[in-house]
């Protein structure tokens, strides 16, 4: 059975504890957390593993049995060559292992000229030491702007790729082909919350392997959802998002 995760970017500006409580009440299995390299999370995670929110969050995760799918984000930059606890990537790794996350997510940035494959390989090795698997996200306008570029970056590293799926533009056959092409490089599937508002596309993810999680996220570029989307009943909204993902995972033959 595919795990469904609610990413923090889809319910901004909830704090991590509120995110877990919302996910649990809405029947969502997991969450995705931003813990570094984003200004909006500094209020919670600026002290890394010494942040008070960590000590509030762990008991809530345990009591609700909500798991952490991934922590992010890590920017692929030259600082990865130097192990320094002050760097954002170290914070992500340290918090990821303490929260029991499966993945740490990274992205290339437009202003870094270093080879992203070299930098990702460094991150993938560091992540293994923290019992995490590094994943790369495809971001337009960066050196990793396509799936082909992402596959080249993660090759032979043990890392993987976040596959962005759009209910508005992808078909079930396209998704199936992408999953087969990525093979073991597939980390998890991410679907923009905005494209689930109308119920998504039933059966779109029906052939997704059961071990592959589906994350409800913000936009593919990682930006939070618009504020007007947030000015609604959040519990009802998240329950509807979860129902839309369930429908996309359900094979058409299951209805007969």
Predicted segments — roles?
Residues 1-5, 13, 17-27, 90, ...:
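Histidine-acidic metal/acid-base catalytic patches
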Residues 1-91, 97, 101, 132, ...:
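N-terminal pre-domain/capping segments
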Residues 2-9, 31-33, 68-73, 104-106, ...:
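Hydrophobic faces of well-ordered beta-strands that scaffold small-molecule active sites
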Residues 10-12, 35-37, 74-77, 108-112, ...:
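Active-site-proximal loop/turn and secondary-structure-junction residues that shape catalytic pockets
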Residues 49-52, 111-122, 143-146, 172-173:
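Active-site-adjacent beta->alpha loops and helix N-cap segments on the catalytic face
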Residues 49-65, 118-129, 178, 202-207:
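Catalytic-core regions built around general acid/base machinery
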Residues 96-114:
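Active-site groove signature of glycoside hydrolases
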Residues 129-149:
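Conserved anion-binding
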């Amino acid at each position: 059975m595919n795990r469904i995760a609610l990413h923090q970017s889809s319910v901004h500006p909830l704090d991590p504890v509120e995110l877990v409580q919302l996910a649990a009440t809405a029947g969502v299995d997991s969450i995705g957390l931003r813990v570094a390299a984003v200004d909006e999370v500094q209020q919670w995670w600026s002290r890394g593993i010494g942040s008070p929110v960590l000590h509030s969050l762990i008991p809530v995760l345990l009591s609700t049995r909500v798991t952490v799918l991934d922590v992010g984000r890590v920017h692929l930059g030259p600082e990865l060559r130097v192990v320094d606890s002050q760097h954002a990537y170290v914070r992500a790794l340290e918090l990821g292992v303490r929260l029991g996350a499966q993945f740490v997510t990274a992205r290339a940035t437009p202003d870094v000229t270093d080879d992203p494959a070299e930098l990702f390989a460094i991150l993938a090795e560091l992540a293994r030491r923290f019992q995490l698997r590094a994943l790369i996200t495809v971001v337009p306008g960066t050196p990793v702007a396509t799936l082909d570029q992402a596959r080249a970056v993660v090759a032979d590293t043990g890392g993987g790729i976040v596959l962005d799926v759009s209910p508005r533009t992808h078909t079930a056959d396209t998704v199936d082909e992408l999953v087969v092409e990525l093979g073991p490089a597939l980390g998890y599937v991410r679907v923009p919350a905005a494209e689930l508002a109308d119920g998504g596309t039933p059966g779109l993810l029906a052939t997704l392997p059961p071990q592959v999680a589906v994350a409800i996220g913000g936009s593919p570029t990682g930006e939070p959802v618009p504020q007007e989307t947030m000015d609604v009943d959040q519990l009802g909204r998240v329950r509807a998002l979860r129902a839309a993902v369930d429908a996309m995972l359900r094979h058409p033959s299951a209805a007969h």
